[in-house]
Amino acid sequence: MVCAPKQLELAKRPQNLPAINRLFAPWSYFIDTTYAVGPRECHDPNHPIGRNDDIMWKIRLSDYARDIFGIFGSECGREWALPHSDFFEGLVAVSGRYYHNLKPDEFGATVIPFFEMVYHDCQICYGKYGYSADKAAEFVAHHVLCARPLYYHSFPDHLYWKSTGKREKQQTPVPDVACYTRSDNGWADGVHPLDVFIKNTYEVLGPLHSVTAHDTLSNLKFLTEDFTLRQATYGRSKDATTVIVNFGTKDAQVESTLGGKVTLPPWGFVIEGPRFAAFHARRWNGQDYGTGALFTLRPMNKKDLKDADRIRIFHAFGPETIKWKGNLYKVQREMVIRVL
């Protein structure tokens, strides 16, 4: 590591950040490791610094990058960095797990979205490092509970989407850890599994983060004694968005305002808020979905879902029929419905 005063000095060189801005004019910039490395001391007699000095210089580097590019973030994240950055990379998850090699079950622990209780409304957070989309069900479920956008790290070589050969899963594990690569009867049917995964997760996590980005986690509940069925509420009163996620290995039964009696498969969820609703469920609003279906609903104007006369419905996989306000709609990919 270069000591902090020299980091800023190097960043200001004409051929460094100023050149990047001149050549490419990015609106956002990421500097690796700045926040990942804790406060350091430097005993060089020419520029000795203590831990607080190290933080001060890293803040100056952050502010400098932010002034140039507009949006700035760094790896991991620090509380002192919150006023000086816009996003943290690595706080939500690491390599498809909760945190590096940490295994919560070995400690008898349950991971909860604690950061979201305090700072969800003032910092965008992502995970980091590669993971396998066909093993990412719990990873996605964790992002749903945290109401955070997903990142996409590992891509096959070359024109991977043109690859031929059988793409069906040879065997479906129980629970289905590859469930978010499903596309049967849905929007991405026949598309490469990675692209299916990107589309499915983006359609859920993108809008979910959009409607909760300025809210904190106001309530967290464990709905079962084994802590596997979890409910998170973002915001308060009529503007709140509620998320219920099943982290268990068996189906879970829940009640929701829009869906009534809902059956969630392992890693399934139901999301309900004034501006967005979604579910990965085996039963929702009186409709049975066999091995599960994934739908999202968004109003097409500034009205809330309950008052909207035009609603976009996205269908990722599973049976194609959804019931809304007493009417049945068959949605293979996506559709804007008119509600009378």
How does the language model describe each region?
Residues 2-338:
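Active-site-proximal substrate-binding groove within the catalytic cores of carbohydrate-active enzymes
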